[in-house]
């Protein structure tokens, strides 16, 4: 069994939903995430008192699937990213699930 984790900025969350539906993933979870990206020159302490940095509205999806479905979904994300040039591509990875209860 695999746990797949997929992420996108808010504008592309529907794309990930469609990929999951098109690949017949029967159960998945979705949550809103505030994403932060610091440039290499930025340090957390550099702006310690200067106020809150605003995040980028993102979405994270998770699903428990078999290895074949994981490969299908991650391949679909690769195909989408290759055919759509964007600053924030869709992201996805899989984790092995050793045991579940």
Q: Which residue stretches match the model-derived regions?
A:
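Positively charged, small/polar-rich N-terminal and surface patches that mediate targeting and assembly
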Residues: 1-101
